[in-house]
Amino acid sequence: MWSHFGTALSFLTLFRLPFTSPRTLTPQELAESFSFFPLVGLILGFCYALPARVLSGVVPSLLLAVAITALTAVLTRALHLDGLADLADGVGGGYDPERRLEIMKDSRTGAFGALAIALAVAFKVAALDAVIRAGSFLPLLLVPVVSRLAMVLAAYRSPYARKEGGLGKPFLEHIARRHLLTALGLTAVSAFLVQPVFGLCALVLAAGTVPAFRLLCRRWLGGMTGDALGALNEIVEVLLLSAAACMY
């Protein structure tokens, strides 16, 4: 269990458990890490909430919102923002699933990808600014938790879109029900302990977003990819931060 959590932590963030060394992981080990995506999200939630709480009376809210957005992007190696950009480029520039997947493999960022990143960052900064000014910091703990759960929900029983291997293939082809249930349990406990009302709203919002996103990915790409899962994380984070800004 500890090693699976370490896999999730090192895959989703810059962090690494002490006394661990890089090694080649089996597809099953990668899939096992899905269970702990929400727990890694909780760690990232502290990276949202703690600076916001400690520095809110010292640093102007807008400047603090920009700094927190930059911090979380760096801590996650901008992995999910990259997925969002790739998906936007593929959908915006391709005319069929094969062409879209081909565009998504290109390491260069196009106009649609740049626009998607700019909009995601702008929405995050605006929402964080509103939440910081309202002094409601607990919802910030849950936003990355639920967004990482959304990736697990979307991956479960989703076909892999590419014929050849890719970063998301080991996750998508080996995820099992127990991984989903563990992730759901960790998210539910976190929501109950941190902020039950917002947690329930966040889960409902994610539950509505994931099926729609899966349907679109089937239509656009013929299935799911690692880039698409990263894009979903960014979309859900934007929606949840915006919801927190409106609720509080």
Swiss-Prot record:
It holds the Pfam family CobS. It is a multi-pass membrane protein. The keyword Transcription does not apply. InterPro entries: CobS. Its EC number is 2.7.8.26. Keywords: Cell inner membrane, Cell membrane, Cobalamin biosynthesis, Magnesium, Membrane, Transferase, Transmembrane, Transmembrane helix. It catalyses: alpha-ribazole + adenosylcob(III)inamide-GDP = adenosylcob(III)alamin + GMP + H(+); alpha-ribazole 5'-phosphate + adenosylcob(III)inamide-GDP = adenosylcob(III)alamin 5'-phosphate + GMP + H(+). It comes from the Bacteria. Its main location: membrane. It is found in: Cell inner membrane. The chain crosses the membrane at residues 30-50, 54-74, 112-132, 134-154, 188-208. Its cofactor is Mg(2+). GO terms for cellular component: plasma membrane. Belongs to the CobS family. Joins adenosylcobinamide-GDP and alpha-ribazole to generate adenosylcobalamin (Ado-cobalamin). Also synthesizes adenosylcobalamin 5'-phosphate from adenosylcobinamide-GDP and alpha-ribazole 5'-phosphate. This is Adenosylcobinamide-GDP ribazoletransferase. It comes from Syntrophobacter fumaroxidans (strain DSM 10017 / MPOB).
